[in-house]
Amino acid sequence: MTMLLDGGPQFPTLGVGGFGTARHHEMSNRDAGMGLNPFTEPSHAAAFKLSPASHDLSSSQSSAFTPQASGYASSLGHHAGQVPSYGGAAFNSTRDFLFRNRNSGIADSSSAGSQHGLFANHGPPGIGEPPGHLIFPGLHEQSSSHTSSNGHVVNGQMHLGLRGDIFGRPDPYRAVPSPRTDHYAAAQFHNYNHMNMSMNVAAHHGQGAFFRYMRQPIKQELSCKWLEESTMNHPQKTCDRTFSSMHELVTHMTMEHVGGPEQNNHICYWEECPRGGKSFKAKYKLVNHIRVHTGEKPFPCPFPGCGKIFARSENLKIHKRTHTGEKPFKCEFEGCDRRFANSSDRKKHMHVHTSDKPYICKVCDKSYTHPSSLRKHMKVHESQGSDSSPAASSGYESATPPAMVSANSEEPSKNSSATHQTNNNSHNTGLLPPNFNEWYV
């Protein structure tokens, strides 16, 4: 239900009227409440009783809605008897009521600064309330200096000292021209642009959960560590020029150090380069190598959601096969139909057919046909200090079968290992079932 109230000449769209002395003779026998719409239901009248009856007010106590204590200020002080009721206002429709322009008189700054009421204007002198306000814009920001004897703060809320449980928050939730004291005081976005997202929030106020993700991007400084040529007067030193973006660093490296087509010496002079001054046969190979030092990766994966980037176009081409499912490299061994996305994986697979085991463990000299098997085996050595189980490596591919290991072992260790294995089997019967088919029951 939309409640249509009359605000008088000061606040024509607030709809709170009937507080002038001209209507006191009409309210002698009933409560002086809000000037409700005559078309509203009578049952809603009790919900808007904001002040005590007029005959209950003593000479020293004033209602929150009398002109002497309200935010109407001096304009109502001089024209208190001219505040009309709802019947005096001509509203053709609800649209006229909601969109009426509030261009009528504004309270004087001297009176508005000293009087604080329910509908006081909070702006600085000479500035009116912005259009599009709520019907009840909120209470005045109550501080320790503004708290009156008729109001007190309970649990962060201000009690108005009226008849009825009417509470209002001390901070109005509206756009005000005056500085605010809440956590979003800098929400005016006066420093907003695409590079500066800081809200200039005061140090004593914490930022909201949303603004912590709007931090200013960290400025990047990339330094060139190319060793310049030494002369008789100047020893060899690094370039040490700094750049704010990768594009600027790459452009500098291409123009200043790598050189153009006339450059025949394709040597990397980056500081502490492991090549040690060894030259490349072609310029493009030097360019690809320099990306190892600069960290440039100019080839992103075009498939949405992947997000991987690569330093070489060849690596991107191989990676895209994981999305397309293309496997152009077929196993050359007769009778094998395995296919692979790159030639290196095919080469690793060929060791299965040739029985070659080029991947050797440096700890125990065991060899394997695939590097993944060697990596699994290395985990056994890493866990030997904490895991004393003799069957820790039983699930890994090994060059020597377990039976041969026990046959080649020394005689004194046979009895001890057999006894130890028997004890472990009797002790771990509850952990490892004798038949692995029981896992699938």
Curated annotation (Swiss-Prot):
Residues 406-429 have a biased composition (Polar residues). SMART domains: ZnF_C2H2 (SM00355). Residues 375-441 are annotated as: Disordered. Keywords: Activator, Cytoplasm, Developmental protein, Differentiation, DNA-binding, Metal-binding, Neurogenesis, Nucleus, Repeat, Transcription, Transcription regulation, Zinc, Zinc-finger. GO terms for molecular function: DNA-binding transcription factor activity; DNA-binding transcription factor activity, RNA polymerase II-specific; RNA polymerase II cis-regulatory region sequence-specific DNA binding; sequence-specific DNA binding; zinc ion binding. GO terms for biological process: central nervous system development; determination of left/right symmetry; embryonic axis specification; neural crest cell fate commitment; positive regulation of DNA-templated transcription; positive regulation of transcription by RNA polymerase II; regulation of transcription by RNA polymerase II. Residues 383-399 have a biased composition (Low complexity). PROSITE patterns: ZINC_FINGER_C2H2_1, ZINC_FINGER_C2H2_2. A zinc finger (C2H2-type) spans 222-257, 266-293, 299-323, 329-353, 359-381. Its main location: nucleus. The keyword Ion transport does not apply. The keyword ATP-binding does not apply. Induction: By dvr1/vg1, activin and t/bra in the mesoderm. By heteromeric AP-1 (fos/jun) during activin signaling. By increases in Ca(2+) in the dorsal ectoderm, triggered by planar signals from the mesoderm. Suppressed by bmp-signaling. By pbx1 and meis1. By zic1, zic2 and zic3 but not zic5. One of its GO terms (cellular component) is nucleus. It is found in: Nucleus; Cytoplasm. InterPro entries: GLI-like (IPR043359), Znf-C2H2_ZIC1-5/GLI1-3-like (IPR056436), Znf_C2H2_sf (IPR036236), Znf_C2H2_type (IPR013087), Znf_ZIC (IPR041643). First detected at early gastrula (stage 10.25) in the dorsal lip and prospective neural plate. Also expressed in the mesoderm at early gastrulation, with expression strongest on the dorsal side. Mesodermal expression continues at stage 12 but is hardly detectable after stage 14. As gastrulation proceeds, expression decreases in the dorsal lip and increases in the prospective neural plate. At the neural plate stage (stage 14), expressed strongly in the prospective mesencephalon and anterior rhombencephalon, after which expression becomes stronger in the anterior neural folds. Transmembrane segments: none annotated. The C2H2-type 3, 4 and 5 zinc finger domains are necessary for transcription activation. The zinc fingers and the N-terminus are independently important for establishing the L/R axis. Belongs to the GLI C2H2-type zinc-finger protein family. Probably acts as a transcriptional activator. May bind to the minimal GLI-consensus sequence 5'-GGGTGGTC-3'. Can determine the ectodermal cell fate and promote the earliest step of neural and neural crest development. Involved in establishing left-right asymmetry in the embryo. This is Zinc finger protein ZIC 3. It comes from Xenopus laevis (African clawed frog). The gene is zic3.
